[in-house]
Design a protein with these regions (language model features):
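Short alpha-helical transmembrane segments in multi-pass integral membrane proteins
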Residues: 1-18, 76-141, 190-244, 301-368, ...
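N-terminal transmembrane alpha-helices
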Residues: 5-42, 56-71, 75, 103-107, ...
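Transmembrane helical elements of multi-pass membrane transporters/channels
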Residues: 16-39, 137, 200-204, 208, ...
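Helix-loop interface residues and adjacent transmembrane-helix termini in multi-pass membrane transporters
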Residues: 30, 42-45, 79-82, 157-158, ...
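Interfacial/gating helices of multi-pass transporter permease domains
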Residues: 39-59, 126-131, 190-195, 239-243, ...
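Small-residue-rich hydrophobic transmembrane alpha-helices
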Residues: 48-108, 145-164, 273-333, 337, ...
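Hydrophobic transmembrane alpha-helices of multi-pass small-molecule transporters
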Residues: 63, 175-179, 205-209, 285-288, ...
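Cytoplasmic helix-loop-helix junction between adjacent transmembrane helices
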Residues: 123-124, 128-131, 138, 142-173
Length: 457
């Protein structure tokens, strides 16, 4: 506010929605980092690599769930802004039906073909076996993880980010505790890490569902919204798919890209794979502000559009981009200075060579993450309006068109690890430029008029 980046009231509303989501992200990413450290201590670097190889497939839960959840927040926020609360119920029921239909088949695929899928990424027999074990078990948590994304977006769409923070952060803590018991207490290794993830996600889903239906939660009191489970589950499916399919594609870009990316990183050797997995976990932690600002932007812009206040929607979008970049600069500087002790903490006793490579990758990520602030925050208004195709194309171009080729050049030429450093930078630069350009054109406002509560069917 003092730097004149954002108007005071908009800063307050943005912060109210963003900080709980940021804390939730930190809790979840910290849990992931702790998982990696636990697996590293219990199984070694092969276990870290195995979990890393399984991660792209687990990421399908967040690709499908996150895509439909983008449609959820767009519809819920616009209908809430227009005071059409009955229409909120329909959006939530349809969202739940779609994510369950999308994710249930993945359980069977990963259970029966998990080993074959992980083997696509590496010829390291031990890492492949461990990754396949992890994937077969964790697959049962995919529908729960996707439903949790929808549940959290419902609350954020109605101006309440604290309840999702409490539930999902609590789930992350429960996950870490369960993993410690299962990995070390019962000596289940990577299977224990996967089982802990399944159980904790199922617990959070149950709490979300019971709270939304009852309209209240013990200890948290009345909720801002109550969902009637009776009624059609298909009414908003078409709109959800129109908005959510490009977001699923955008999420799948990285999930799918991880497969060739990890295969390319494997050409550097198992030590670099372990370092890359560690760096990616730390990247996830650094990226948590973007989740908060992106969702805050989607909610606030969506509510303004639902009220027909397009100028207010634009002001929120533009100022949240500035706010996000300022926060990213500060957080990236802190991580850059303390990169070595941070990596050593997450490495779980890894070798000095692994730690050294991971530190260099994290340092490169600190530069790239600032542009992620632009990309993610600029995508928020586009998601809120239903203009979700542009961020999908920009993400695909950045990763498949630039980042992966640079990584491959690093693995096959004298460019070496510099190829991975440049890949981090390309991954965020291209979407940042293209997403902000699309936001600046104002075409997203035109798209939003097709999805507002008073729009013709």
């Amino acid at each position: 506010v003092r730097a004149d980046l954002i108007e005071r009231e908009r800063a307050r509303r943005t912060t109210d929605l963003a900080w709980p989501r940021i804390l939730t992200g930190i809790a979840r990413m910290s849990k992931n980092a702790v998982d990696i450290a636990m697996v590293g201590v219990a199984v070694g670097s092969a276990g870290i690599a195995g979990v890393g190889f399984a991660s792209p497939f687990w990421g399908l839960a967040f690709a499908a769930g996150g895509g439909i959840a983008a449609g959820t927040i767009a519809l819920v926020s616009q209908r809430y802004g227009a005071k059409r609360l009955g229409a909120v119920d329909q959006a939530v029921r349809s969202s739940a039906a779609v994510v369950v239909a999308l994710t249930l088949p993945l359980i069977a695929i990963f259970w029966f073909f998990g080993a074959d899928l992980v083997a696509l990424l590496s010829n390291d027999a031990e890492a492949v076996a461990l990754g396949a074990t992890y994937l077969r078990v964790v697959a049962f948590g995919i529908p729960f993880a996707a439903l949790n994304l929808v549940g959290s977006r419902v609350f954020i769409g109605v101006n309440d980010a604290q309840i999702p923070m409490v539930l999902r952060s609590g789930g992350a803590v429960a996950n870490a505790v369960l993993n410690a018991v299962l990995i070390f207490g019962l000596d289940l290794g990577v299977a224990g890490a996967a089982l802990g993830t399944v159980l904790s996600n199922a617990l959070v889903t149950g709490i979300f569902a019971s709270g939304l239906v009852a309209g209240r939660l013990p200890g948290l009191g009345e909720l801002p919204v109550q969902i009637d489970p009776r009624g059609s589950y298909l009414g908003d499916v078409r709109e959800l798919l129109d908005i959510g399919t490009p977001v699923i594609g955008r999420n799948l870009v990285w999930t799918v890209a991880e497969i060739p990316m990890l295969a390319i990183v494997a050409l550097f050797g198992p030590g670099v794979v372990a370092a890359y997995v560690i760096a990616r976990r730390i990247w996830g932690l650094m990226n948590t502000p973007g989740w908060g600002f992106g969702l805050a932007s989607s909610s606030l812009v969506g509510q303004a559009l639902g009220n027909g206040h397009e100028e207010t929607a634009e002001a929120y979008g533009r100022e949240i981009v500035r706010f996000a970049v300022a926060v990213y600069i500060v957080s990236a500087a802190i991580v850059f200075v303390f990169a070595k002790p941070i990596v050593a903490t997450f490495a779980g006793g890894g070798s000095e060579s692994v730690i050294s490579v991971a530190v260099s990758l994290v340092s490169a990520a600190c530069v790239a993450i600032v542009l992620q602030g632009v990309s993610g925050a600029a995508a928020g208004p586009l998601d809120a309006s239903g203009d979700t195709s542009w961020p999908f194309y920009s993400q695909a171009l950045g990763i498949f068109g630039v980042a992966i080729p640079l990584a491959y050049l690093g693995a096959t030429t004298s460019l070496g690890l510099y190829g991975l450093y440049l890949a981090f930078l390309a991954e965020t630069t291209v979407p940042a430029v293209l997403n902000y350009y699309r936001f600046a054109t104002d075409k997203w406002k035109q798209v939003s008029r097709q999805h507002r509560p008073d729009a013709p069917a």
